Each structure stands twice: as C-alpha cells, then as structure tokens.
Amino acid sequence: MLWSLFVVLQLVHTGRARTVHGSLDSDVAWHGRGQHIVTFLFHGDQAVLRVKINNVAAAAGKESALYLYQDEQWVQIHSSLEEYSCPERLSLAQDTIPLNQTEYNYTLPQMAYPKAWYVIYVDKFTCLVKYEDQKSDAITFEVAMLNPDAAGNPFDHFGADESGLHEFFFLLVLIYFVAACIYIQALWQMMKKGGPMHTVLKVLSTALLLQVVSALANYLHLSRYATDGKGAPLVGSLAELCDIASEVQMLYLLLSLCMGWTLSRKKKSQGKPLQWDRTPASTGIAVLAVSAQVILLVWELFEDANHHSFHAHQSLAENLLIAMKICLAISLACGLYQIITVERSTMKRQFYITFAKGCFLWFLCHPCFVAISFLFKEYQREKVITVGVIVSQSVSMIILYRLFLSHSLYWEVSSLSSVTLPLTVSSGHRSRYYS
C-alpha cells in the first residue's frame, strides 16, 4: 500500500520542477492553439526566462517562438475562448521570443508585485485550419525561470508562491533537532517504564517522527531545488508520503480513543476504568474515517500536481477533505461534551478538556487557515496554509504529549493502579500498530 502510494506521488511530481525539459510539438500546439510549456510567478525587476534548444535549424524552419502572457491576458482569453480567433489570441501576448538561436535569456519587465506568466509554444502551423503531421526532427528544450535573489541577481529558482518555504523548513528542522537533544532521553526512559499511557505515547511518537522526516525531506528537496530548479523528486515524494501517514495515524489515534471512551462509558459505571477498547463499533468507525481520508488525499494529489501537503487550490477533493475534518471535530466535540458533563472527578474532567483542545486544534487548523488565507493575495495563500497548519499541528502534538506524559508521571509517582486514571490501554490493543 505505502509503496503503491509512493509510486503515485512520484508520477504526480513530474511537473513540479522550475527548470523544465521537454519537446516542442507542432501537433500539440495546433490542437491546443499553442503548447503550454510552464507557468511561473515572477517578481522584481531582474527576473529572467532562460531558454535552450538543441535544433535551431528545425525551429527556424517552423518559425518557432515562445509567447509570453501575463495572468490578466491569459484569464481574458480563456474566459471567452469563442470570442478570439487564433491570431487574435497570439496578438494578446505580452512578448514573443523567437527560437532562432541555441540559447536565449529574456529579462522580464519590472513588476511592482508578483505576477504569473504563462509560456506558450507556437509555430507557423499553429493557426492553420488543417494540419498534416510533418515528419521533422524533434526539437528538445530546457526552460529555466529565475527570480532576483537578495542581491538583485537572477539566481533564485523559487517562484513568489514558494519563496520563504526553504527557510521555514530549515527553521522547523532546527527546532526539532534542538527539542530532540533536550527531551529524547527522558521520553525514551518514560516509554521504557511502560504505564497506562505507554501505547498512546508510542503511536503519538511515531506520528511525530513521521512529521520530522517529512520536514527534513522537504528541506533537502528545497535545498536541491534552490540550486538547480529541479529538486529531488524522490525526496519530495517521501515528504508527502510521511505527511499522509502522519495524518492517518493521528486520525486513527484521536478518533479511536474518543469513540472508545464514549462507547465504553455506556456499558460501564462511573467507578470503572475507561479503556482504549477494541470494540467492533469504535474500530469500524475509525477505519472508515481513515479510509475516506486516504481516498481524498490521493484524489487531491491527482487534481493538483504542485501539491505541497496543504495548499490553496480549491478542488472538489480539497473541499471534501475540509468538510470531513469539520464533521470529525463536531462529532468529537459531541462525544467529549457528553463525557465531560457527567464526569464528577475534577482531574478526569480536566484531562478530557485538554484532550479536546488538542483534537480541535489538529482537525480545525486546516479549515481555519484555508479561510484565513483568503485575506491574503493569491500567491501568498499556499504559504499561509502550509506554515499555519504545520505549526498548529506541532502545537497540538505538544499539548497531547504534555497531557499523556503528565498522567504517566502522576501514575508513577503516586504508585496508583491504572484503574484510578482516566485512560488505560488494554494489552490486546497494542498489536494493532506493531504486529
């Protein structure tokens, strides 16, 4: 399952690089009234589009050229395609790059704010009424998009929608490393001792480890991307695979815990312990929710090739995923509210309240930051969502860690049995994750 998903991610990521390779195809250009090469968010006054081709003679014979459209012109054309003839569409291009030399560096006009530019291939056959396939030599190309760096030189491969993510993941990895150096030994000793929170901490630690690997993989991918505009697609796919696995594991953990408490409470008296029960109902609900989330996440990947784990591209799969998270938060709120209102123990009640905070932050951070992102410009939205959700999920994990560790310490110091604690884990449950 994981290997199949990794292969899917690898296939989806083929169009993510900002140094693009390919072939210029007259047939594709004729059918589409232009062959789309790439779209990129340029900014500043020294942005450069660098074009290389291998067969100048064939390109010159076809009168090949790259047409550059700003976002406004492109939207205008595609909002009313039937109103424009092929020559009229070409006349709306901001500029044209004739492909009559091996390498061409085009400096874009100064931009007060970031703009999306569309690069389209056109030749003398594009606007013909009828086209017969011409047997000619292939023309391969390489197009590199470069924004000005901090010194104003055109060496930055990141688009305006991606700038800052490299630094963010570096800072995130650094924080994870420092936190690991400080807390890893104490956490390991706590987990070796066992206790009522042992299995919960193992599952939570696995989910956190997946997030750490994802952050490190994203940083390595973006570091390579900064130098060549291509990155490391395998590493980028690994980052997304870890993100999906972490999301799935946390969903199963939080939902099965809450459903187990809710269902077991109907069968047990107040004085008996609450356990992470392996009831068919709680397990079935958790598995159903996890399956639905995996389907939506994979569907979302196919709908957006530039996937960054969380993004502003509002597809049907994305909207369904957001709706699912809101519904899960509401259902957990109802279940925990019923438990809290009838709970007489102050310690247990505080435990459930803190657990609810961690759950709501985990499930609602994505929908909330999607809504908040609409306050920003379009090219900033993906960064707002990505940074906001990752930080919020990290805070949620900290809340849950503090909660479970504090109760483990309370159990150890007071030498109480697990019967007096608000959460215990049955030994039979442990095999579900580590069998």
Curated annotation (Swiss-Prot):
- Respond yes or no to whether keyword Signal is given for this record: yes
Q: Name one GO biological process term.
A: response to pheromone
For membrane topology, the record states:
Multi-pass membrane protein
Q: Can you tell me which residues are glycosylated?
A: N100, N105
The entry's cellular-component GO terms read:
membrane
Task: Kindly list the places in or outside the cell where this protein is found, as annotated in its UniProt entry.
Answer: Membrane
Signal peptide limits: 1-17
Q: What is its main location?
A: membrane
Xref: InterPro entries: GPR180-like_N, GPR180/TMEM145, GPR180/TMEM145_TM
Query: What keywords tag this UniProt record?
Result: Glycoprotein, Membrane, Signal, Transmembrane, Transmembrane helix
Look up the domain of life of the source. Eukaryota
Which residue ranges does UniProt annotate as crossing the membrane? 168-188, 200-220, 244-264, 282-302, 320-340, 355-375, 384-404
Is Transport one of the keywords?
A: no
**Residue ranges that the Swiss-Prot or TrEMBL entry lists as coiled coil:** none
Matching PANTHER family: INTEGRAL MEMBRANE PROTEIN GPR180 (PTHR23252:SF29), INTIMAL THICKNESS RECEPTOR-RELATED (PTHR23252)
* Name of this chain's protein: Integral membrane protein GPR180
Q: Which organism is it from?
A: Xenopus laevis (African clawed frog)
- Species lineage, top-down? Eukaryota, Metazoa, Chordata, Craniata, Vertebrata
